[in-house]
């Protein structure tokens, strides 16, 4: 397919980094590209974001294109791939939410949550019966410090810990 003179000038100016020409190209093709993305994604805002991202990606490699057909093919392929990646990501996210919801609705979750709360309540009530030093040792141990670290921090013998 032969390019007309306008297309040849457009391609050369884009290739040379002329931002005014990019703006013209953007205004001419943005709605078309968003419409194409919208055939893959339901959210028009997401589609606009995808197209904006592809324009940025194009600008980084603009020197690689010698004709308008190649530029448009790049846009369509990049938009398609970006949309498909978004869909895959959304599917993974949805699967995680579904699995998480199933767990939250399960009896296991209820049992674990109740047990944790009860155990925490019992421990909290029992800690108040410890001496101040014993409380410090316990808190440091719960903070995953070693006996040596606890002894050094509190200035006591390791055997006391």
Give the location of each predicted region.
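A short pre-motif secondary-structure segment
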Residues: 137-138
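Arg/Lys-rich amphipathic alpha helix in sigma70-family domain 2
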Residues: 66, 77-97
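Sigma70-family region 2
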Residues: 15-16, 42, 53-71, 91
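Helix-turn-helix DNA-binding module
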Residues: 125-128, 132-133, 143-161
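Short, small-hydrophobic-rich alpha-helical interface motif
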Residues: 14, 33, 37, 47-58, ...
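Internal acidic/polar
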Residues: 4, 85, 93-120
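Short amphipathic alpha-helical boundary/capping segments
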Residues: 9-13, 121-130
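N-terminal module of bacterial RNA polymerase sigma factors
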Residues: 1-32, 39
């Amino acid at each position: 397919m032969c390019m007309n003179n306008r297309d040849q000038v457009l391609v050369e100016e884009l290739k040379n980094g002329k931002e005014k020409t990019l703006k013209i190209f953007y205004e001419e093709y943005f709605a078309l590209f968003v419409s194409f993305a919208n055939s893959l994604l339901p959210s028009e805002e997401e589609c606009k974001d995808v197209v904006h991202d592809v324009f940025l990606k194009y600008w980084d490699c603009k020197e690689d294109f010698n004709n308008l057909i190649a530029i448009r093919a790049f846009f369509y392929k990049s938009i398609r791939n970006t949309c498909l990646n978004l869909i895959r990501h959304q599917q993974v996210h949805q699967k995680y939410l579904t699995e998480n919801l199933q767990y939250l609705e399960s009896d296991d979750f209820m049992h674990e949550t109740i047990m944790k709360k009860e155990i925490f309540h019992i421990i909290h009530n029992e800690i108040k019966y410890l001496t101040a030093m014993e409380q410090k040792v316990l808190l440091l141990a719960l903070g995953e410090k070693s006996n040596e670290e606890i002894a050094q921090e509190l200035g006591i013998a390791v055997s006391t810990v």
